[in-house]
Curated annotation (Swiss-Prot):
Gene Ontology CC terms: cytoplasm
Protein keywords: Chaperone, Cytoplasm, Stress response
CDD domains: GrpE (cd00446)
Protein name from the UniProt record: Protein GrpE
Cellular localisation: Cytoplasm
Family to which this protein belongs: Belongs to the GrpE family.
Function: Participates actively in the response to hyperosmotic and heat shock by preventing the aggregation of stress-denatured proteins, in association with DnaK and GrpE. It is the nucleotide exchange factor for DnaK and may function as a thermosensor. Unfolded proteins bind initially to DnaJ; upon interaction with the DnaJ-bound protein, DnaK hydrolyzes its bound ATP, resulting in the formation of a stable complex. GrpE releases ADP from DnaK; ATP binding to DnaK triggers the release of the substrate protein, thus completing the reaction cycle.
Subunit structure, as described in the record: Homodimer.
Positions with biased composition (Low complexity): 1-11
GO terms for biological process, alphabetical: protein folding
PROSITE patterns: GRPE
Region (Disordered): 1-22
Source species: Bdellovibrio bacteriovorus (strain ATCC 15356 / DSM 50701 / NCIMB 9529 / HD100)
Statement: the UniProt record of this protein carries the keyword Magnesium: no
Gene name linked to the record: grpE
């Protein structure tokens, strides 16, 4: 009877047990691979974030470098103009040089997408203009700009400086 109990207690080799163990081993290896892949991608993403922050910081710090370099050329021209002793004989040449430098500055601003917004005679627009006062006149339609103290400018499509203007109103 003891032999019967021994044979009943000891399980005969079951082919399913080997398959299950093999399947468990495969799943553990696959889980380890997924974990390693995850850790690698996480580290790669952290590096990406760090680089993106660094690039953004450098862009913020040095983004205007090209504009500044171009502006320095204009500053040099104004410095040369200011060093000239202006007399009646050279006034026209001096004025022409200053006009050319002013045109160079306007051209530079346009190259950098800083655009003057036409104001004189245009309808008043509070998103573009700041009304300093109003003036009674029959020379301009009411609500239109009679005088401009500061021209409005935009960078791309954003107003970066509203114009300071005087708005026409009906004479009384």
């Amino acid at each position: 009877m003891s032999e019967e109990n021994n044979s009943q207690n000891s399980n005969p080799p079951n082919p399913e047990n080997g398959e299950i163990a093999s399947e468990i081993q495969k799943l553990q290896e696959q889980a380890e691979k997924f974990k390693n892949d995850y850790l690698y991608l996480r580290a790669e993403f952290e590096n990406y974030k760090r680089n993106a922050i660094k690039e953004r910081s450098e862009l913020m710090k040095y983004g205007g470098e090209r504009l500044v370099r171009d502006l320095l050329e204009v500053v040099d021209n104004f410095d040369r103009a200011l060093s000239v002793n202006v007399s009646a004989e050279n006034f026209n040449t001096f004025k022409q040089g200053v006009d050319m430098t002013a045109q160079e500055l306007k051209s530079l601003l346009q190259r950098h997408n800083v655009i003057e917004i036409p104001a004189h005679g245009a309808p008043f627009d509070p998103s573009v203009h700041e009304a300093l006062s109003s003036e009674a006149t029959d020379q301009m339609a009411p609500g239109h700009i009679v005088r401009v103290f500061k021209k409005p400018y935009k960078l791309h499509d954003k107003v970066i400086r509203p114009g300071q203007v005087v708005v026409a109103k009906k004479p009384e």
